[in-house]
């Protein structure tokens, strides 16, 4: 039986480059990939020690790395060779060629900036999850953007998309039977974006949602009367708030997000 291979992806910045190259290379073989381990932002020899020791415990492992910091790269190379582990430097030859041609040494400030960007993105994504669907009204006060609207207007994916643009976004469903939290009326309405939609389109979306859950699609939730009632109520709330209203009918999440980003930059919503 052909032995599987374990791949260890290591980087002192984001590991995506190593992962992409490894995936493309592996596609040329019928090799069984037993496991893939990823290590981003490796910044000291203790981390390298742990990674190499783990790889050494696998009978057939490969370390693929994009290390730039010279001391760490050399240490990784040395430790891997000591344990007889195959190691591939996919970034080094390119950096060396540029350095030889220009006489300029690579700088590592970008690694720090990249890590800070990564941590910031994780922070805003966690924010979007924590304050999704009105879970905690405190999120309304802390958010850069608050998205409101009836159910199935893509509030959650919109907030996640905005999070990837480093924007802390919370969202809140508007339901006729439940008064909006007072926090919604305490913040600057310029931070609030109301989503509305054509009732007929929303009815279809909700019916499909019910079917996907194995439920009867003639439930009150997906009736035209109920949908119109919810949208009317939501638009009344938006009018009271004086917030920006976006019609998301047949709009992709990216398109709606770009409208919001444009407004935040001082542009128009249309």
From Swiss-Prot:
Enzyme Commission identifier(s): 2.7.11.32, 2.7.4.27
Catalyses which reaction(s): N(tele)-phospho-L-histidyl/L-threonyl-[pyruvate, phosphate dikinase] + ADP = N(tele)-phospho-L-histidyl/O-phospho-L-threonyl-[pyruvate, phosphate dikinase] + AMP + H(+); N(tele)-phospho-L-histidyl/O-phospho-L-threonyl-[pyruvate, phosphate dikinase] + phosphate + H(+) = N(tele)-phospho-L-histidyl/L-threonyl-[pyruvate, phosphate dikinase] + diphosphate
Domain of life: Bacteria
Main enzyme class: transferase
Xref: Pfam families: Kinase-PPPase
Gene Ontology molecular functions: ADP binding; ATP binding; phosphotransferase activity, phosphate group as acceptor; protein serine/threonine kinase activity
Keywords from the UniProt entry: Kinase, Nucleotide-binding, Serine/threonine-protein kinase, Transferase
Protein residues bound to ADP: 149-156
HAMAP family, per database record: PDRP (MF_00921)
PANTHER family, per database record: PYRUVATE, PHOSPHATE DIKINASE REGULATORY PROTEIN 1, CHLOROPLASTIC (PTHR31756:SF3)
Described function: Bifunctional serine/threonine kinase and phosphorylase involved in the regulation of the pyruvate, phosphate dikinase (PPDK) by catalyzing its phosphorylation/dephosphorylation.
Family to which this protein belongs: Belongs to the pyruvate, phosphate/water dikinase regulatory protein family. PDRP subfamily.
Protein name: Putative pyruvate, phosphate dikinase regulatory protein
Organism: Caldanaerobacter subterraneus subsp. tengcongensis (strain DSM 15242 / JCM 11007 / NBRC 100824 / MB4) (Thermoanaerobacter tengcongensis)
